[in-house]
C-alpha cells in the first residue's frame, strides 16, 4: 500500500442530535461521539481496505434550525481495519499510523472545518470545508443529510495532496 491509496471515504453517521427544528437562534450542537461512527475506505490499484476511525469531537452550528457550520476532530491513532483480521490487520494499521502514511504519532488528529454551507431541499446541505490531515490542509466538498436525530455525510478525500510534499 505504498502511497497508492487515492481516496479516503468517510461516512459520518448517527450523530444523535436534539430536535433542531424548534431552534430560533444560533446554537452550537455538540456531536455525541459515543453514538457516532466514521467508516473509511481506501482504494489502491490492486484492491481496497476499509475500517473505522474514532471521532474525538465535533460540533454543528445551527441558525434558526438550519445548518450553517461545523467541525470534526478525528483520532488518527484509532484507525482500525475491518476487512482484515489478526496479523494482517495489525500490519495494515501499523502502516497507516506510520510516518509513511498518516504519521499518527506526530499528527494524532485530523480536522474538518466547514467553510461554507448551502441548504438544499429535504435536510440536504452542500458543505465546503478545509480538511487537515498530517499537517496539510486542502479544501473538500460533500453533501450532508441532516434529519431529526441523524446526520450522514460521504466525504471523499484525495490523499495525493498529503504525499506531494512528503
Regions found by a protein language model. Give the residues of each.
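Positively charged n-region of N-terminal signal peptides that target proteins for export
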Residues: 1-4
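Low-complexity, acidic/polar, glycine-enriched regions of mature
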Residues: 20-166
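Bacterial N-terminal signal peptides
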Residues: 7-16
Amino acid at each position: 500500500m505504498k502511497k497508492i491509496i487515492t481516496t479516503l471515504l468517510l461516512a459520518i453517521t448517527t450523530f444523535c442530535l436534539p430536535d433542531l427544528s424548534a431552534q430560533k437562534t444560533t446554537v452550537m450542537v455538540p456531536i455525541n461521539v459515543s453514538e457516532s461512527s466514521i467508516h473509511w475506505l481506501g482504494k489502491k490499484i490492486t484492491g481496497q481496505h476499509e475500517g473505522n476511525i474514532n471521532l474525538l469531537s465535533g460540533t454543528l452550528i445551527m441558525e434558526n434550525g438550519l445548518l450553517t457550520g461545523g467541525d470534526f476532530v478525528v483520532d488518527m491513532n484509532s484507525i482500525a481495519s475491518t476487512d482484515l483480521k489478526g496479523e494482517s490487520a495489525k500490519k495494515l494499521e501499523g502502516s497507516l499510523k506510520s510516518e509513511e502514511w498518516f504519521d499518527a504519532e506526530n499528527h494524532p488528529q485530523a480536522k474538518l472545518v466547514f467553510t461554507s454551507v448551502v441548504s438544499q431541499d429535504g435536510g440536504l446541505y452542500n458543505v465546503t470545508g478545509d480538511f487537515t490531515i498530517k499537517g496539510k490542509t486542502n479544501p473538500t466538498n460533500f453533501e450532508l443529510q441532516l434529519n431529526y436525530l441523524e446526520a450522514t455525510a460521504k466525504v471523499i478525500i484525495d490523499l495525493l495532496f498529503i504525499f506531494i510534499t512528503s
